[in-house]
């Protein structure tokens, strides 16, 4: 199963055995293998009714094959970030554009994706973290210079000393960053992106 977020709307790719319970805000689509999948991202962007489109993977295709067809008409960028915990279990979060987020950024040419994750955490927060295990990939869209972009972000668990000093990268629009206790986490997650919630959920499973 794979989710792509269009702001607070969601496109889910799944097999027959993974189809979630259908509700009023969910639409299930059973496409033929020759369907024009490349139009779906633009349909998600333009529709005022679609909140959650569930796209069943045709029997003749793999998830990867469907994803390639789906994204054939958009530019895909790769990025990476970290879910950083200190020795007391507090999480590192940043505040940018009025939303709480996790440090992340675009992969540089020739750079290993795990190196991207560590570099971006250090640049955006000032925290020197230690790399842990891979957690998950998230996908989300945005518009840039009139073009629809899909960003794939690879997330890693990371570790840092207790209350490690942090400094927001203000030139990237980050207003503040710091360590969040479990007691304050729900408050922050009430004002974050759906993909960030997915990262925390993935960490609970690993």
List each language-model region with its residue ranges.
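Active-site beta-strand termini and strand-to-loop segments that position acidic
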Residues: 84-87, 158-160
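Conserved beta-strand and immediately adjacent loop positions that scaffold enzyme active sites
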Residues: 81, 90, 176
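Unchanged
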Residues: 107-195
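Acidic, metal-coordinating catalytic segment for phosphate/diphosphate chemistry
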Residues: 35-81
